[in-house]
Amino acid sequence: MVHAGGEFRLGEHAVYPGTFDPITPGHLGIIERARHLFARITVLVATNSDKQPASTPSGRAIQLRRELPADWDNVSVAAWAGLTVAFCRQHGADVIIRGARNRSDRRHEYQLAAMNEALGITTLLLPAQPELAAMSSTVMRGLGS
């Protein structure tokens, strides 16, 4: 697909979900790459019953907005407590973007992608940049304490 500005685009609207507790350089790297592939990106600050974030999705969304460069004008941030697929349907997104740092992440993401595909939403898996792959949110929280 070609965007009106003549740039190559994979699609119109994609969603990049995560807990982002906190946002890491790896997350920002995924957003940076994805924003060039789609006309619009929504970074979806979500809940995850397996994780206990330090703040609410709304609080993390506010913090994440502050971290994004001002010129990333095709990137928006939203907080969401439901299923990512439901958000995609409600907001007209047809692709979910996910990042993977290692083999374990890829295995987990392939399972999620299969479920999303069965529900009609495509997943685009972007590998982490090698220099950022070790910097998880867990590591970032440890560095902050």
Locate the predicted segments by residue.
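Nucleotidyltransferase catalytic core that binds NTPs
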Residues: 1-145
